[in-house]
């Protein structure tokens, strides 16, 4: 175990690929390079607000001392760090956006963890880079706390995700227009240090394809395969890579749907080549079950990134990745074949997951129709998703009359439920459960493992932000503990529906990309 300021950091990425070493932060196009060397911009008063002991243990890091906090806030780097900002492009809301890059993220290099894996350390909110597009490269406490807590919460939920080591306040005010409506205001600034094996995105390949840089794209593919997909061997390595990324992406989206997570901004520059959840912005968990729910105000006109559309968007994004890799593949029909097979791969994973949520002993051929009808009922009745599945675990063997069933689930309804539809669906479900070859206890255990009892709803995060901005970190500390056991009853003070006051409140139901 070592302190961060003494930790040996390796610079595998910058030593492997061409970069712009000028240290010039002027916004510009950077053709022919994968990164620009940059330094974080110091802040006035970095103060540690939160520290993930679990992530620190994974990285082999001691509890932070003042020298470490200076690094976490972006005021200095240790002698082995060679910070950089990555160059990538992306499709945003379905449209090509050109060069984007790390506009407020600065990677410090790679840290060897206790598991002998290397983890990329990245500061978010540590100042401008050549990719900041004339912005300040900063982040506010509001968005930084959300990223810190949700990164860790998703890990404990069992969802593939980046992690977060620390949350540091900067002592500086940051000007932000939260809803892009002309009402800008100063907010307290903060920096998050986030952690992942790599932050390579679909967009890293898109920028190289757009610039027709075949050699560099092939080099990046080879690097990703060697480090993160060592099982890939033989011919068609790029096709194999695409297939592996597609499968991991399907896994990730299925896990999002399992816990009711809505990413909110699934642009291709926010899609990880490792299939982990990346870039926590205007995200949300669903409260009432609504496939059309999007937490992102920018997404409201078309609801492109709505809860129920995430699998389709992932497919579309994979199509953009296939296009970016096509000039490396002599027989592009092989990429097309992988993409065509994605829907079958996704559906198999999805229905298997749903069988676990519902406590089935196994996924049988006719279960898919039952699952589809079950979800149709949820879309109509719109119960609180988290609470509904928890109540379902304790459903009596004989659910009783339509009135009995409605009363059983009454605590999770936001509006008057369709009693007949609910009863018909629950009766069919109960009939199927009785055919399980496993015991009721085993079935219930499967359901408890698949259905979280506590999720970080936006109104809870909003309360934590408001308190922290006033100097009260008690709720933050409580939530840091609650998120570690989301399948237990430890956080049952929050086993309630979203309060009425939060239904239309900014920061609870309405969010934006402003951070």
From Swiss-Prot:
The active site is at residue 269. Keywords: ATP-binding, Magnesium, Manganese, Metal-binding, Nucleotide-binding, Nucleotidyltransferase, Transferase. It catalyses: L-seryl-[protein] + ATP = 3-O-(5'-adenylyl)-L-seryl-[protein] + diphosphate; L-threonyl-[protein] + ATP = 3-O-(5'-adenylyl)-L-threonyl-[protein] + diphosphate; L-tyrosyl-[protein] + ATP = O-(5'-adenylyl)-L-tyrosyl-[protein] + diphosphate; L-histidyl-[protein] + UTP = N(tele)-(5'-uridylyl)-L-histidyl-[protein] + diphosphate. Mg(2+) binds at residues 270, 279. One of its GO terms (molecular function) is ATP binding. It comes from the Bacteria. Its cofactor is Mg(2+); Mn(2+). ATP binds at residues 101, 103-104, 124, 136-137, 194, 201, 279. Its EC number is 2.7.7.-, 2.7.7.108. PANTHER family: PROTEIN ADENYLYLTRANSFERASE SELO, MITOCHONDRIAL. Belongs to the SELO family. Nucleotidyltransferase involved in the post-translational modification of proteins. It can catalyze the addition of adenosine monophosphate (AMP) or uridine monophosphate (UMP) to a protein, resulting in modifications known as AMPylation and UMPylation. HAMAP family: YdiU_SelO (MF_00692). This is Protein nucleotidyltransferase YdiU. It comes from Cytophaga hutchinsonii (strain ATCC 33406 / DSM 1761 / CIP 103989 / NBRC 15051 / NCIMB 9469 / D465). The gene is ydiU.
């Amino acid at each position: 175990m070592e302190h961060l300021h003494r930790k040996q950091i390796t610079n595998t990425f910058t030593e492997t690929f061409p970069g712009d070493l000028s240290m010039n932060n002027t916004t510009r196009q950077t053709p022919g390079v994968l990164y620009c060397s940059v330094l974080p911009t110091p802040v006035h008063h970095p103060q540690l607000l939160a520290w993930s002991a679990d992530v620190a243990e994974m990285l082999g890091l001691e509890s932070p001392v003042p020298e470490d906090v200076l690094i976490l806030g972006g005021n200095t780097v240790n002698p082995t760090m060679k910070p950089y900002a990555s160059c990538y492009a992306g499709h945003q809301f379905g449209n090509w956006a050109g060069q984007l890059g790390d506009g407020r993220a600065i990677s410090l290099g790679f840290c060897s963890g206790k598991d002998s894996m290397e983890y990329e350390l990245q500061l978010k909110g540590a100042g401008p880079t050549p990719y900041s597009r004339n912005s300040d490269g900063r982040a506010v406490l509001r968005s930084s706390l959300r990223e810190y807590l949700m990164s860790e919460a998703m890990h404990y939920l069992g969802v593939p995700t980046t992690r977060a080591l620390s949350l540091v306040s900067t002592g500086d005010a940051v000007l932000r227009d939260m809803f892009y409506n002309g009402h800008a205001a100063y907010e307290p600034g903060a920096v998050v240090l986030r952690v992942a094996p790599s932050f390579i995105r679909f967009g890293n390949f898109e920028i190289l394809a757009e610039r027709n840089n075949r050699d560099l794209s092939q080099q990046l593919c080879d690097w990703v395969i060697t480090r993160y997909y060592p099982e890939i061997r033989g011919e068609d390595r790029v096709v194999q890579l695409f297939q592996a990324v597609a499968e991991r992406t399907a896994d990730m989206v299925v896990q999002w749907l399992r816990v009711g997570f809505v990413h909110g901004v699934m642009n291709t520059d926010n899609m990880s080549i490792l299939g982990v959840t990346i870039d926590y912005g205007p995200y949300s968990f669903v409260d009432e079950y609504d496939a059309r729910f999007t937490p992102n105000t920018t997404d409201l006109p078309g609801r492109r990134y709505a809860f129920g559309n995430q699998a389709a968007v992932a497919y579309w994004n994979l199509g953009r990745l296939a296009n970016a890799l096509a000039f490396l593949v002599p027989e592009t029909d092989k990429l097309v074949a992988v993409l065509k097979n994605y829907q079958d791969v996704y559906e198999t994973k999805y229905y298997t997951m749903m069988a676990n949520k519902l406590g089935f002993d196994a996924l049988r051929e006719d279960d898919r129709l039952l699952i589809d009808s079950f979800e149709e009922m949820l879309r109509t009745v719109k119960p609180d998703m988290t609470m509904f599945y928890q109540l379902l675990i304790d459903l009596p063997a004989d659910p009783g009359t339509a009135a009995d069933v409605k009363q059983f689930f009454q605590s999770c309804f936001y509006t008057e439920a369709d009693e007949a539809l609910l009863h018909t669906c629950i009766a069919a479900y109960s009939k199927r459960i009785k055919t399980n070859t496993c015991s009721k206890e085993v079935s219930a255990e499967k359901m408890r493992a698949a259905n979280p009892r506590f999720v970080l709803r936006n109104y809870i995060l909003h309360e934590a932000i408001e308190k922290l901005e006033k100097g009260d970190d008690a709720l933050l500390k409580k939530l840091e503990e609650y998120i570690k056991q989301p399948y237990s009853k430890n956080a049952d003070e929050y086993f309630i529906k979203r309060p009425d006051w939060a239904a239309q409140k900014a920061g609870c139901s309405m969010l934006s990309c402003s951070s």
